[in-house]
Amino acid sequence: MPRKLFSKMPTTQGRSFYEELRGHDSEGYDGGSRAGLLDEENLNHNFQDYDLDHAEGLTVDDSRATLAGLRKTPASKVPPGHQNDRSMWLAHDDDADNDVPPSLLVEPRGAHLAGKPKRKQSRQAAYTMPGSSNTRAQWETIQAHQPLHNDEPFTQSHRGNGAPGSLFSGSASLDAKKMAEWRWANVQNLDKFIKEVYDYYRGCGIKAIITERVLHLGNVAFIAVLLTFLTQCVDYSLVRGSQKLSQIIVPQCTRKMSGWWNLGLWLFAFYFIWKAIQYILDLHRLFHVRDFYTHLLNIPDHDMQTITWQEVVARVMALRNQNSKTATTLTPLQRHFIGSQSKERLDASDIANRIMRRENYLIALFNKDILDLTIPLPFLRNRQYFSRTLEWTLMFSVLDMVFDEKGQVNQKFLRADRRGEISEKLRSRFQFAGIMILVLSPFVSLYLVIYYFLMYYHEIQKNPSVLSSRSYTPLAEWKFREFNELPHLFQKRLDMSKAFATHYMDQFPKVKTEMVAKSVAFVSGALATVLAIASVFDPELFLGFEITPDRTVLFYTAIFGSIWAVAHGMQSQDDVVFDPEYAMRNVIEYTHYEPDHWKDRLHSYDIKLEFAELYKPKIVIFLEEILGILTTPFVLFFSLPKCSDQIIDFFREFTLHIDGLGYVCTFAEFDFKKAMANAKKPSDGGDVRDEYYSAKHGKMEASYYGFIGNYGNFALNPKGAPGSHLPPGMRNQFHPPPAWPGLNSPPLGADMQTSRMGRSEFRSRSRAPGQGLRPGPSMVAPSPMASILLDPHHLPPSHLVNPGRASHPHRVQQNRRPGESNIIEESLEDEERGREGVNRHDDEEVYGHGDGMDESAWQTSPARTLSRDNSAIEGTGTAEAGVVDMIYQFNQAQFTRNGV
């Protein structure tokens, strides 16, 4: 609705700004980036006949298109929006293309593509049988009696995106699975479809979604009826002397309501009817998504509450692999569409990018501190303010303007010459949003107060301590959230951190406060004890004796008892250790938020005050939400318009286009091939440019390792381990104790030479033969292929997973005790090699044989890797190695020599 209002505003150019954006997108213009550039992707593509429909004006003259050919083209044959693109291609044509022999030309010099009739004649000529006249006559006779198949180009149906005619003709006999397959093959907006799949997952199935919507309408209707009855249909002046409800009810109260209340009821009726119709019309889409889960992903509706999102992603990837791309003949319009809607980009990273395309930009805006959220008041200028209301206005003012209906970034936001115009439009949107908040603030604030009062009153009455419970503020949630982190995964991480955050906040203040609390508890407890003992000897005194006028012993006993309870609650328990730094580190393990100025200061009181602004009592957050409806217009009118230029520059400089995925935030596209290499390099600070184009507070590293941990690559990020969001080199390594008793024990050493005792049938296949349990980090790291939710182009290189994974025999010999070198277990090693062969065969069956994979280093056994240290020792085995093994050994030697 607001977007349409903006589009109707008059402009000096005759067309509104938003009409230009829509017209610009429909033409398929790529922000000026196509000018002067060759389409290298389609340079060697096999174009078909219907591709020439878009190039009727091209003249084959010396193997290039000429301007003369364009002048001969009728105006009606040129599609709109293609003239400028064609001129750009012609302006940058290279003269070297003229050196083509005439024999290699498709048509002789001077030939002209006259249209479809000539192409049809050329195809008929291609069927002519070469040879003598008798042979050609026989061929024509056979062709007349048995004509060849019709090779006419495929023409798109005029029904648009509807099902094929064969499907419609037999729709009565089609089952739901075939229709689900057809809808999956004809998805037009992949971003929208993936979001629908994710929303269906979060809603726990169609039954839960419908139930939630019906109950929502019922709750809203109940609130409206209850408020109308309590405010308009009850005469409270008659309550004191009445005995029945009918005595205080106003007859025909609906006819006596005020005009404002009637207006509110009409608005409620409009909202109720609008939501009901919306829910009813949305049932068709819900059933389609249900069929997608049930028939294509094999996930029934009753499993939606227990299945994990990672399993859903794995099944979507398997479905994509079953329906691989087979079309090799695409029109330019279809290629432009596939540029952002390709189903080939559907692994865990791509799915998260499609769902979080808009939110990733907002996360980066908060991380880069681009948004000015201060209130322009003298006593609140240095305090950032953010509420849900302001979050909604940012979604409307910024994101709805940047992204089009297809979910892609508007091209004109990427052009520097439109910076001033777009910035002015953004300021006007901020001001319009502020006006709308001022108009709707009375209704919204009243609804929130009544809704939360009715919801939490009973809980507060039963458990008053709920008022002191804390939660993260909306600003803290956007600061803690990571790139490509889906909402349910982020909420899970926050919920796990709240217990540690509460424990941290309970440690402040302590010493002086506990001293005062102990004194108050002692005095109040002593007085309450004296009054209680006196009431035991004389119960009548307890009820009737007045210590002060109209205040009996019972009253003061209750007062002193309450004071003692409050003072005792302010004291820490005896078994609680005061260590704020340790408590804050536990919080950071889950929030992944540690600004640079927090380092080495986690114990300070300043850090506690800063964290208290992010973790506030729920009652304070609720009051800020109510007041935020009144203060948000000040931020929209005065603070945010000042940073509109920086916002436009941010979208232009931090937007990246990925083939098959579209435009995404640069921070959201994880460079898996460089992340681990950068994590192992010491940070040298960098220059100002690197600091500007990088995320703050380690957000990129935390997002990368958090993503790897969420989607199951335990080789890079063990799930649930302390410091799991940190790089492997920054986590504390586990050092197992040595075996006991030692192998140098004479009785044990003698027995082990002739015995097979102590061998386990469940030994890890990743441990090298002969490598015992010893102190230090693990020698062999699992393969990065442990994550099946990433495509090969997203997997990190194998040599970056664990550069020290190769075994070093001389180090093993140094750690052995004097009697261990005499122990020989040749039969054990032979059996271990046989088991490795079986395990390697099992891995090939699970992951395939590596066809089409970018990295092939993991095709060899991790336990048999070579390095510069052990290449000489195992030199006898290299003579029988194949070409792949020799290349692998050479790469490992190079990486080891470089110290990677």
UniProtKB/Swiss-Prot annotation:
InterPro entries per the record? Autophagy-rel_prot_9
Composition bias, kind Polar residues: at what positions?
Answer: 857-870
Annotated Gene Ontology cellular components are: autophagosome; cytoplasmic vesicle membrane; endoplasmic reticulum membrane; Golgi membrane; phagophore assembly site membrane
Q: Where is this region: Disordered?
A: 111-134, 723-873
Q: Does the keyword Transmembrane helix apply?
A: yes
- UniProt keyword annotation of Endoplasmic reticulum present: yes
PTM details? Phosphorylated by ATG1. ATG1 phosphorylation is required for preautophagosome elongation.
Give the record's GO biological process terms.
autophagy of mitochondrion; lipid transport; piecemeal microautophagy of the nucleus; protein localization to phagophore assembly site; reticulophagy
The protein's location, in the record's own words, is:
Preautophagosomal structure membrane; Cytoplasmic vesicle membrane; Golgi apparatus membrane; Endoplasmic reticulum membrane
UniProt intramembrane annotation: 435-455, 619-639
Q: Where are the transmembrane segments?
A: 214-234, 263-283, 525-545, 552-572
* Keywords for the protein's UniProt record, in alphabetical order: Autophagy, Cytoplasmic vesicle, Endoplasmic reticulum, Golgi apparatus, Lipid transport, Membrane, Phosphoprotein, Transmembrane, Transmembrane helix, Transport
Which ranges of this chain reside in the Cytoplasmic compartment per its record?
1-213, 284-434, 456-524, 573-618, 640-900
Record topological domains on the Lumenal side: 235-262, 546-551
Question: Which portions of the chain have biased composition (kind: Basic and acidic residues)?
Answer: 832-852
Q: How does it sit in the membrane?
A: Multi-pass membrane protein
Q: What is known of its domains?
A: Forms a homotrimer with a solvated central pore, which is connected laterally to the cytosol through the cavity within each protomer. Acts as a lipid scramblase that uses its central pore to function: the central pore opens laterally to accommodate lipid headgroups, thereby enabling lipid flipping and redistribution of lipids added to the outer leaflet of ATG9-containing vesicles, thereby enabling growth into autophagosomes.
Quaternary state and partners of this protein? Homotrimer; forms a homotrimer with a central pore that forms a path between the two membrane leaflets.
- Family, similarity comment: Belongs to the ATG9 family.
By what name is this protein known? Autophagy-related protein 9
Organism annotation: Podospora anserina
Source species taxonomy: Eukaryota, Fungi, Dikarya, Ascomycota, Pezizomycotina
